[in-house]
Amino acid sequence: MKMMSGNKTISAVALATLVSGCATTVSKAPSYDANGSAASQADSFIAAENEKYMSGVDKVGVLSCNVMFGVNSSASASTSGGFRSDATRATGTTRRSDVTVSVTYAAKGVDEAEMQRIANEACDNAEKQLANAGFQVVPHATIKANPHYQAMHAEGRESPFEYKGNAGTRYLVLGREGESISDPRYIGTASGLGQAFKAAGGSSAQQHEGRLMKDLSLTGVNVNILIDFAQLESDGHSSFGGFASKDSAKVDATIQLAASGDVRFQPLSKQKCWSRFGKEECMIKPNHMPVFSTTNALATANTFYSSIEDVTTTSDKLTSGFTKSLGFLSAMSGTSSSTARDITRYQVNLIPASYDAESKELASGLLEMAASKAASSR
């Protein structure tokens, strides 16, 4: 692989602790058996909620399918003084100087077009796995031709879009190619308010979904999958209750491809419809939707990246050095408490073919187990 100018390339098989307070590891989480049966593994990976309402469910259709790809994973941790730690300091002695550790991993090497192909295949596979599990699956072409489905996607959010998590973590969310994303879990506050106003007029995406289910006499299925490349764990920013001092700041990272998600059913038998403002509205009774979700992510031990590079910028290093110096001087002077910043950035260089193959296999395994568990709940 070509080295980036000024960047340190880290071996994909041997990562060390590179920054004080930041431990990096490639230890492998337990992976599922891709060659084993879904039924025998489902209980180890999939949990069921409201599964009793699967009784009688046969004719189904996938009304939404969204795949979220992790592209940026971040976490932070910090040291902190406990309750009254400064008040108990003797006059004229050094004040406490704390540090905040910030670590970011960015995935590079796979573009949106490839992610879209993975999402398309995962959504097609969802229908296949439901059929293999014994459900009567209405083809997507039939659903797509329905005017309620078209109206639902006219109210959705354009795909792909960036979803921002905590501490700078970022994901790309993609639906089926050429279709929008209508699941409220992916819609931000502004769009959510917009949907609420539309609901008053009977035109929200969810209401179109309800009418579609009634029109085609099917149980709606909503599929959500997350493909992530890194799992970061922080030891936090303060001790429990804040009474004791916290003298460590650590972020642990596991670089491993994993899939998680859920498959939600909206049983037609639990749907209630009524008329409001001259329009029919339909919804599933509260707490009557069976959901089959991962309790443990499906992970693979197979390699999907070529290397990991330290891409901490000069600006990051200057900021870290400046805040550490300032914190030391402030503490020594006894004039103020201060927090230094320690910033580190890594780039995970993906192997497109490996990332593609492993992502598809993980998504397929998740869907097969969820469909199997759903079928056995009927």
Task: Tell me the role of every PLM-derived stretch.
Residues 2-11:
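Bacterial N-terminal signal peptides that target proteins for export
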Residues 23-121, 125-138, 143-178, 183-256, ...:
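A structural "domain/chain start" motif
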